[in-house]
Swiss-Prot record:
The keyword Nucleus applies. The gene is NAMPT. The modification Phosphoserine is found at residue 472. This is Nicotinamide phosphoribosyltransferase. It comes from the Eukaryota.
Length: 491
């Protein structure tokens, strides 16, 4: 952020209103508040059973929040004054903890006396385990732990995008392996089309970066800069794209000149892959007559490295894909691969970028398999469903206090609402461990201090205003790999 933008963000104004009043609500002589974040397990699913269970989550995005919003001198005299004035009007009362913030400014030069411990970024952890913990490091600042809940819990978004994207990768990997015998090109099978479908530039950057944990294809440019700035990669960029047509570059030629539009575009990009949206008027006519006959000579002469990628963009996704493949299969030479599935020639592929979410994706690849088409023939583009059609409830992302110190005594605390057992929270100081069998287990009530459980997988990533541990994007990707990828990799 430039200096002006830096000055704009005020951590004193980046919390839920009610938290401004909480310093007055904790028990007298509270000196520590310790809280944790998890993606709660749903032990009792609603009657409307979800097709996808989301049993494990990808932990990603906390590093961005810590670096962008919490590190360094985040408290200044001006920010305290600004907050004081805003809250006086907002509450019509003097409830703001001016003294507490001045203490942080004076004693710590505006750095937050907080410690955050977290699992490594990119870790794949079963639901119901601790992912990070937060505690104050100065007894005067017991109220600060849950003040920053608001901004820290926004990590639900990159976690959920990365998790949902990875679940789609599981589906694609399974069907690609079954219909081709290998995982070649898996990381380009789901392309991010979501830039225009998200709520803001920042959302675009965060969401696109989360998808790139699992894949390498994106049209959401904002993700690239975020990854380079907050994570870093060994490659010059973490995501790639290809030249592609939109409807305007076709329809601008006029309805009677779709063939001319197609011809011009494939000629402009003859030595690289090029995607051409082909449903401006009639996708089936485009495949059969224009691509299959009129321009066939231009397509068959393209190289394996520079295929034409035909993009349908309307209609029922499964029906459209199958019909397009059927037409192309009659117009171009189809071969059978080693697994007995049909394969278009290497200079021709299809991308479905309309109506793609995790459920339609599953339907399309299953439908293709049943019709004996290899998944090698297709890639997918997903926008709103990939980056926007998600909420904090999908993975039940939750932040709760589990331990306090009052009058010098540590107390394990929790909630356990009578009407919803799913909302029961964990007790005491928490740690995360691997059992000898390789399973993850969260230990409550400080039991992780006992030697027998091995080391804690939560590492200090932030302490007293400093980010103390960072992960490169390459490490994040490695942590998030699928088991099927690890098994298929050459040993």
């Amino acid at each position: 952020m430039n200096a002006a933008a830096e000055a704009e963000f005020n951590i004193l104004l980046a919390t839920d209103s009610y938290k401004v009043t909480h310093y007055k609500q904790y028990p007298p002589n509270t000196s520590k508040v310790y809280s944790y974040f998890e993606c709660r397990e749903k032990k009792t699913e609603n009657s409307k059973i979800r097709k996808v269970k989301y049993e494990e989550t990808v932990f990603y995005g906390l590093q961005y929040i810590l670096n962008k919003y919490l590190k360094g001198k985040v408290v200044t005299k001006e920010k305290i004054q600004e907050a004081k004035e805003v809250y006086k009007e907002h509450f019509q009362d003097d409830v703001f903890n001016e003294k507490g913030w001045n203490y942080i400014l004076e004693k710590y030069d505006g750095h937050l006396p907080i410690e955050v411990k977290a699992v490594p970024e990119g870790s794949v952890i079963p639901r119901g385990n601790v992912l990070f913990t937060v505690e104050n490091t100065d007894p005067e600042c017991y109220w600060l732990t849950n003040w920053i809940e608001t901004i820290l819990v926004q990590s639900w978004y990159p976690i959920t995008v990365a998790t949902n994207s990875r679940e789609q990768k599981k589906i694609l990997a399974k069907y690609l392996l079954e219909t081709s015998g290998n995982l070649d090109g898996l990381e380009y099978k789901l392309h991010d089309f979501g830039y225009r479908g998200v709520s803001s530039q920042e959302t675009a950057g965060i969401g696109a970066s989360a998808h790139l944990v699992n894949f390498k294809g994106t049209d959401t440019v904002a993700g690239i800069a975020l990854i380079k700035k907050y994570y870093g990669t060994k490659d010059p960029v973490p995501g790639y794209s290809v030249p592609a047509a939109e409807h305007s570059t076709i329809t601008a030629w006029g309805k009677d000149h779709e063939k001319d539009a197609f011809e011009h575009i494939v000629t402009q990009f003859s030595s690289v892959p090029v995607s051409v949206v082909s449903d401006s008027y009639d996708i089936y006519n485009a495949c059969e007559k224009i691509w299959g006959e009129d321009l066939r000579h231009l397509i068959v002469s393209r190289s394996t490295e520079a295929p034409l990628i035909i993009r349908p963009d309307s209609g029922n996704p499964l029906d459209t894909v199958l019909k397009v493949l059927d037409i192309l299969g009659k117009k171009f030479p189809v071969t059978e691969n080693s697994k007995g599935y049909k394969l278009l020639p290497p200079y021709l592929r299809v991308i479905q970028g309309d109506g793609v979410d995790i459920n339609t994706l599953q339907e399309i690849v299953e439908g293709m398999k049943q019709k004996k088409w290899s998944i090698e023939n297709i890639a997918f583009g997903s926008g709103g469903a990939l980056l926007q059609k998600l909420t904090r409830d999908l993975l039940n992302c939750s932040f709760k206090c589990s331990y306090v110190v009052t009058n010098g005594l540590g107390i394990n605390v929790f909630k356990d609402p009578v009407a919803d057992p799913n909302k029961r929270s964990k007790k005491g100081r928490l740690s995360l461990h691997r059992t000898p069998g390789g399973n993850f287990v969260t230990l409550e009530e400080g039991k992780g201090d006992l030697e027998e459980y091995g080391h804690d997988l939560l590492h200090t990533v932030f302490k007293n205003g400093k980010v103390t541990k960072s992960y490169s994007f390459d490490e994040v990707r490695k942590n998030a790999q699928l088991n099927i990828e690890l098994e298929a990799a050459p040993h």
